[in-house]
């Protein structure tokens, strides 16, 4: 009987390398594919994609599997990066990694894998898929510190129908141990951090190449001018570092609480529990449920509003215009427009939506939040 073919997205990192190994052990016909999504040279003039592809080649040779490289730079620019820049222009804080999964890793890459006669595709994500009773469910990875369902939350059951997540049942330590036992060349390679196309580089320096900075005033909520900002796009709600206005007022740290786009003003408040940092709900659009529109119009669940945040109890109200009003059981700090609200039922990731508007807490409920 012909072996089932799996095309594995290999990044040069340890997770996807171990994923490829596990699939080969299970008897699949495994092909490794490296996706080049960004024409990338770091601050030292080194093309990190070239280094990563070298690691893919070395690991593939160690595992005895064929490998290819595919260039998705144009798709990435058109479908992910332009959105990222547009959102920043709107004063929002986008999450390009979620869109990269939806548009590149589970769309463009799937199309490419099918051209290689793949039965399945696989990645090194820490997530699990449950296929029972004709339904596909996306479940959190076994390692709570590494669970990546947040980034996969805009996928659909159709996306996931041909996907395998071989390391979803493992912890990061277990994955590293397997790589070390196999003497894989990248067994001790550190995890990549930051937005994929920025990597370890300075965010401000990177953005200057694409968006002209427009410095403006930093003001308190009372209207007092406290300093100048470098451009609203460089700041996010809840940010404390890099404001350059310490030592004023009560002496407590200052936090970004809002952006006034019209007047190019960054609004700040003092104290980590200032009421202006908290919200009681949000309005979201681009709602995507893994299994389509099967939820009731109003339902209770938990949610995350940023990666690795503790789950928050919420009630979701789907509105006739297709947006959602998400009501928080308790006020939540630093919820940010442009970010992704991801909904869960215990371990099951239900789907997600893009945060459009945050409903700020009024001062009377401040004590409950602090």
Swiss-Prot record:
Residue numbers annotated as active site: 100 (nucleophile), 196 (cysteine persulfide intermediate)
Signal peptide (from-to): none
Catalytic activity, as annotated: S-sulfanyl-L-cysteinyl-[protein] + uridine(34) in tRNA + AH2 + ATP = 2-thiouridine(34) in tRNA + L-cysteinyl-[protein] + A + AMP + diphosphate + H(+)
Catalytic class of the enzyme: transferase
GO molecular function: ATP binding; tRNA binding; tRNA-uridine 2-sulfurtransferase activity
List of residues binding ATP: 9-16, 35, 124
Region span, Interaction with tRNA: 146-148, 306-307
Coiled coil: none
Residues carrying the site annotation Interaction with tRNA: 125, 339
Keyword hit for Cytoplasm: yes
SUPFAM superfamilies for the chain: Adenine nucleotide alpha hydrolases-like
Span list, region Interaction with target base in tRNA: 95-97
Enzyme Commission code: 2.8.1.13
Keywords carried by this UniProt record: ATP-binding, Cytoplasm, Disulfide bond, Nucleotide-binding, RNA-binding, Transferase, tRNA processing, tRNA-binding
A biological process term (GO) from this entry: tRNA wobble position uridine thiolation
Disulphide bridges, residue numbers: 100-196
Its job: Catalyzes the 2-thiolation of uridine at the wobble position (U34) of tRNA, leading to the formation of s(2)U34.
Family: Belongs to the MnmA/TRMU family.
Protein name (database record): tRNA-specific 2-thiouridylase MnmA 1
Organism: Geobacillus kaustophilus (strain HTA426)
Gene name of the record: mnmA1
């Amino acid at each position: 009987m012909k072996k089932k073919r799996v095309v594995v997205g290999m990044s040069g990192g340890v997770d996807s390398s171990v994923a490829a190994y596990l699939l080969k052990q299970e008897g699949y016909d495994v092909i490794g594919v490296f996706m080049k999504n960004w024409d990338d040279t770091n601050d030292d003039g080194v093309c990190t994609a070239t280094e990563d592809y070298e690691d893919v080649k070395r690991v593939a040779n160690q595992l005895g599997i064929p490998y290819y490289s595919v260039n998705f730079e144009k798709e990435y620019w058109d479908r992910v990066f332009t959105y990222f820049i547009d959102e920043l222009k709107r004063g929002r804080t986008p999450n390009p990694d979620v869109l990269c999964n939806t548009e590149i890793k589970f769309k463009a890459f799937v199309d490419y894998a099918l051209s290689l006669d793949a039965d399945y595709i696989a990645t090194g994500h820490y997530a699990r898929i449950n296929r029972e009773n004709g339904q596909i469910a996306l479940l959190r990875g076994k390692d709570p510190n590494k669970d990546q369902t947040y980034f996969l939350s805009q996928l659909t059951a159709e996306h996931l129908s041909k996907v395998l997540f071989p390391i979803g049942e493992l912890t990061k330590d277990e994955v590293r141990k397997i790589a070390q036992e196999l003497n894989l060349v990248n067994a001790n390679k550190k995890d990549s951090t930051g937005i994929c196309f920025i990597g370890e580089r300075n965010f401000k320096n990177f953005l200057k190449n694409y968006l002209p900075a427009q410095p403006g005033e930093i003001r308190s909520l009372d209207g007092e001018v406290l300093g100048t900002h470098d451009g609203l796009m460089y700041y996010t709600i809840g940010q404390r570092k890099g404001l350059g206005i310490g030592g004023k007022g009560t002496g407590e740290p200052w936090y970004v609480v809002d952006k006034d786009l019209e007047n190019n003003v960054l609004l700040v408040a003092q104290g980590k529990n200032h009421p202006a940092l908290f919200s009681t709900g949000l309005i979201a659009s681009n709602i995507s449920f893994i299994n389509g529109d099967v939820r009731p119009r109003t339902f209770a669940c938990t949610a995350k509003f940023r990666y690795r945040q503790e789950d928050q109890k919420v009630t979701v109200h789907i509105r006739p215009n297709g947006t959602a009003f998400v009501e928080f059981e308790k006020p939540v700090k630093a919820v940010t427009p442009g970010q992704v609200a991801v909904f869960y039922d215990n371990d099951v990731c239900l789907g997600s939506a893009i945060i459009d508007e945050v409903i700020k807490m009024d001062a009377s409920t401040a004590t409950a939040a602090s």
